[in-house]
């Protein structure tokens, strides 16, 4: 099984999107595709842009002023001295320019970090591979990161093994699969018509995701399989960093991609693609990004880990208040963060969906950050689900000890301490049950059996 890595290099502006449609300082696509091992390094060579504290000053000042008047800004420091004092007070937190990085930015810029005696320094990264590498080598203390990436590193899938930790879940929902307008012009409107088109018009169809073990890869594979398309036999899969998806579709490097917002909405805004399916269509209230770090960071800085989690819990609660959504969209839209028009971020951030080919709807299952603590709790069943899909698609050559691995990674004890400090309710069970797009029920109770239940798979020894 192979995927392809889309290489990038500096190129004339005529072959790539303009600076206002992709993240600042990103390389332009070349279209040069190379086959690589399935879990090869999924990154690109690029300088990391440090989001730091640079922001579009007037907007932030006005937003902060309004929030202070409304009584939203933190008024006191919760942990500043004694045995609870954070061991490390300046915390480097990585993020990728996606809408769901919002809790990191809000915690930093709205002062929720100060309440818990720390300073969050957001670091904007160029690719998920860069996030992985900097977490592992200690350049980043923690990061907004793909759930499945953390589990892959912990198990050494495709690279060096490093014990990892998930402090909390950051969001549910809010990703999507986008197809090119060329497919729409050829009659593709939905999953059924896509499957028929691929069968009747044989050629090399190329779909992009953002990291081989990550969430976008798993949503893409799961959706394609649900319509009878094998993601490794019937189509070609490549890896592209999120901010470069739109530029690469524009120059014809792919037929479709799976990524987080706002890049699906941006493809529609730029009139180059349409939304085939949202990730909440695949799994309503699915886990997505997490606050991830190494196990060593938690062991060496338990108070800092707890303070960081508490700060992001408060930020998550703030974001989920409908009164704050438009303000947050403007806050994260700047070049230091997502680097996209605020209106492109805001529409789907508010659940206002337009698929680009005539359908508009208000989605009740839009991107959520809190939902009374249901979003943020690190359910063991959520982590185990990604392991079942890694097994299904041959990324794991043998069955892991699902529950043991999830229990090692997901830091439920620290989460509960942070939740108590932030006055966030905690679910009573570490497992939850969900029904996915193909009708299968996932409850975390028989993971090996679940992993083996899929007729479309790439794993040796796995058969439905």
What are the functions of these language-model segments?
Residues 1-55, 76-79:
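N-terminal secretory signal peptides
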Residues 53-70:
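N-terminal export leaders
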Residues 80-239, 251-268, 272-285, 435-455:
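Short, glycine-/small- and polar/acidic-enriched structural segments
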Residues 140-142, 240-275, 294, 326, ...:
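Ligand-binding pocket segment of bilobal, Venus flytrap-like solute-binding proteins
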Residues 177-178, 290-293, 297-298:
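Short glycine- and hydrophobic/aromatic-rich loop-to-beta-strand nucleating segment
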Residues 300-411:
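Secondary-structure end/capping motifs
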Residues 384-464:
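Conserved C-terminal helix/tail region of periplasmic/extracytoplasmic solute-binding proteins
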């Amino acid at each position: 099984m192979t995927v392809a890595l889309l290489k990038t290099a500096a190129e004339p502006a005529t072959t790539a999107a303009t600076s206002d449609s992709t993240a600042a300082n990103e390389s332009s696509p070349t279209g040069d595709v190379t086959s690589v091992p399935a879990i090869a390094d999924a990154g690109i060579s690029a300088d990391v842009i440090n989001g730091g504290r640079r922001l579009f000053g007037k907007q932030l000042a006005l937003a902060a002023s309004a929030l202070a008047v409304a009584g939203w800004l933190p008024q006191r420091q919760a942990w500043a001295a004694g045995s609870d004092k954070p061991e490390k007070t300046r915390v480097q937190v990585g993020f990728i320019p996606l809408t769901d990085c919002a809790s990191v930015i809000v915690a930093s810029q709205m002062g929720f970090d100060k309440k818990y005696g720390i300073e969050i320094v957001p670091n904007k990264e160029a690719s998920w591979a860069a996030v992985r590498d900097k977490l592992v080598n200690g350049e980043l203390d923690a990061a907004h990161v793909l759930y499945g990436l953390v589990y892959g590193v912990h198990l050494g899938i495709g690279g060096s093994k490093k014990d990892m930790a998930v402090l909390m879940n950051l969001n549910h929902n809010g990703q999507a699969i986008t197809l090119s307008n060329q497919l729409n012009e050829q009659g593709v409107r939905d999953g059924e018509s896509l499957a028929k088109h691929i069968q009747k018009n044989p050629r090399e169809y190329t779909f992009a995701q953002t990291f081989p073990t990550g969430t976008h890869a798993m949503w893409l594979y799961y959706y394609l399989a649900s319509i009878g398309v094998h993601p490794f036999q019937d189509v070609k899969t490549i890896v592209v960093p999120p901010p470069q998806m739109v530029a690469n579709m524009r120059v014809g490097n792919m037929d479709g991609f799976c990524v987080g917002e706002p890049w699906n909405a941006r493809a529609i805004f730029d009139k180059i693609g349409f939304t085939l399916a949202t990730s909440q269509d695949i799994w309503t209230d699915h886990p997505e990004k997490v606050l991830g770090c190494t196990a060593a960071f938690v062991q060496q800085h338990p108070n800092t880990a707890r303070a960081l989690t508490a700060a992001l819990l408060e930020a998550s609660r703030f974001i989920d208040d409908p009164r704050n959504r438009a303000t947050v969209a403007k806050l994260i839209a700047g070049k230091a963060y997502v680097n996209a028009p605020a209106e492109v971020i805001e529409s789907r951030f508010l659940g206002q969906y337009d698929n680009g080919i005539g359908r508009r709807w208000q989605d009740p299952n839009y991107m959520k950050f809190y939902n009374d603590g249901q979003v943020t709790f690190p359910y063991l069943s959520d982590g185990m689900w990604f392991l079942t899909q890694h097994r299904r698609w041959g990324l794991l050559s043998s069955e892991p000890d699902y529950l043991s691995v999830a229990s090692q990674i997901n830091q439920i004890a620290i989460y509960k301490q942070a939740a108590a400090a932030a006055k966030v309710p905690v679910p009573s069970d570490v497992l939850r049950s969900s029904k996915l797009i193909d009708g299968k029920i996932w409850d975390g109770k028989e993971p090996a059996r679940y992993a083996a239940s899929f007729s479309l798979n790439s794993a040796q020894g796995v058969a439905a």
